[in-house]
């Protein structure tokens, strides 16, 4: 187990931290993240799996898993609930807040941890989602209406003091937990015991038999083609009137369903490898997805966002792919949309960055995914001293690629035209760690299951010369990878 207790005493002497992560390594040649999450799900209803692959389909170095959170923190319409899951009677704190961020900061301060160079980038923190509707806290003047699912949470985060990280480069499983510095000797012994329990669980734990997903109705869009095209025309009217330059209109696809989304996740990770792949399970909801797009990333003081805008389906051959790429980079409508969203990304990053540090590090490259290709850029800045990871979420959520420009007015028009609570779609999924870092993706290319219904939501960016029928088809293209994963999962996996 490392660091040693002597090393931790040296860290404690600095007086900056409340917790230090410790790690034990075991060989991973007998285990996979998919097998491990089955074991963790059997041990705890609350669990997650975060994985990554690049656009070239090379797997990222780490897969992160967690189970048995210390607490679950939710907020819905300003009502914040903190449930201490380790307490026998699961005591719950309920309070009304103007913004959940202050409470999140208090919780994170109690676990403040250093970055240990030998360890992976995530060694404990808050994992979960901020919904699209979380914007009500950073933009209180934006009035979001009551819709068909008023109990959909604005935020659902779980605090994980223990992390299981698969290091795919070294073929090791890293078992990580925290040593609290207040009672160092006892906490160190407790951590040794916890790491042994984690090792035993991974090696010998019972595995969950996830029930297969069974659709009880056809997957259908909420807005038929004719209705969606009407919405596009109304959005174009606002553009011509000068209210906005661009707006993203989404179209949910729903079906009644029973069973688990776990096999859908397995298909997605195999057929649609993406920078952000996630499986998330709680008492309230089950999520599976493969998002291509970062919302915001904070490492130390460096902030990064990666706007993706401009879409084409993948070609059947390399030559067809190249032709589609060339056409995409010559499409004035797509280029105009992308440039607007790069400018919006610079503006969002600039709100919390030091003056003069915001720059476009990469501009208009083609990013390939299993079903579609996008134009991508990278915008970065240096975080101001008076700002933190929660400020970063406030500044950038929802992404311009899922709302529009100007963002505030675009969100008002979305509220008027969509007439439904977006929920997770267009929000953020990822982690805020105990060292102050943040890594979140935009909540797209996902399916969630709640109250016996699955939902897949996708959108299209509407600009002045948008063709309504093409925008409807773009929504369908973006949803296609998830729909195919559901269909393939139903056929049965070994």
Language-model segments: what does each one mean?
Residues 1-494:
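Extended alpha-helical targeting/anchoring segments
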């Amino acid at each position: 187990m490392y660091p040693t207790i002597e090393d931790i005493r040296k860290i404690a002497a600095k007086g900056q931290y409340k917790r230090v992560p410790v790690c034990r390594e075991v060989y991973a040649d007998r285990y996979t993240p998919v097998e491990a999450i089955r074991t963790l799900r059997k041990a705890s209803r609350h669990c997650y799996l975060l994985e990554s692959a690049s656009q070239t389909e090379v797997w990222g170095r780490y897969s992160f898993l967690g189970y048995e959170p210390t607490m679950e923190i939710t907020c819905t319409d300003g009502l914040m609930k903190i449930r201490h899951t380790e307490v026998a009677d699961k005591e719950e704190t309920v309070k009304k807040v103007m913004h959940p961020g202050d409470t999140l900061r208090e919780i994170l301060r109690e676990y403040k941890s250093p970055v240990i160079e030998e360890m992976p980038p995530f060694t404990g923190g808050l994992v979960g989602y901020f919904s699209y509707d979380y914007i009500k806290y950073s933009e209180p003047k934006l009035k979001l209406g009551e819709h068909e699912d008023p109990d959909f949470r604005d935020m659902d985060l779980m605090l994980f003091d223990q992390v299981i990280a698969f290091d795919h480069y070294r073929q090791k499983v890293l078992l990580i937990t925290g040593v609290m510095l207040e009672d160092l000797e006892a906490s160190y012994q407790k951590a040794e015991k916890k790491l042994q329990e984690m090792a035993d669980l991974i090696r010998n734990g019972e595995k969950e038999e996830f029930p297969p997903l069974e659709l009880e109705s056809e997957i259908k869009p909420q807005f038929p083609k004719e209705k969606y095209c009407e919405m596009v025309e109304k959005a174009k009217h606002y553009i011509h009137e000068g209210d906005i330059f661009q707006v993203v209109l989404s179209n949910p696809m729903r079906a009644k369903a029973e069973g688990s989304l776990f096999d859908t996740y397995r298909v997605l990770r195999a057929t649609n490898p993406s920078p952000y792949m996630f499986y998330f399970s709680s008492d309230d909801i089950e999520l599976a997805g493969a998002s291509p797009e970062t919302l915001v990333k904070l490492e130390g003081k460096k902030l990064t966002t990666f706007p993706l805008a401009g879409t084409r389906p993948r070609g059947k051959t390399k030559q067809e792919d190249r032709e589609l790429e060339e056409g995409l980079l010559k499409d004035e409508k797509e280029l105009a949309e992308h440039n607007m969203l790069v400018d919006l990304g610079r503006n969002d990053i600039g709100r919390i960055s030091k003056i003069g540090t915001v720059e476009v590090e990469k501009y208009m490259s083609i990013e390939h995914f299993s079903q579609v290709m996008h134009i991508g850029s990278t915008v970065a800045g240096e975080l101001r001293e008076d700002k933190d990871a929660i400020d970063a979420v406030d500044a950038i959520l929802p992404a311009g690629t899922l709302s529009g420009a100007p963002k505030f007015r675009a969100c008002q028009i979305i509220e008027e035209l969509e007439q439904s609570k977006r929920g997770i779609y267009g929000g953020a999924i990822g982690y805020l760690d105990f060292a102050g870092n943040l890594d979140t993706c935009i909540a797209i290319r996902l399916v969630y299951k709640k109250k016996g219904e699955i939902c897949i939501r996708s959108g299209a960016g509407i600009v002045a010369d948008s063709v309504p029928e093409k925008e409807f088809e773009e929504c369908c293209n973006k949803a296609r990878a998830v729909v195919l994963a559901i269909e393939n999962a139903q056929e049965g996996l070994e």
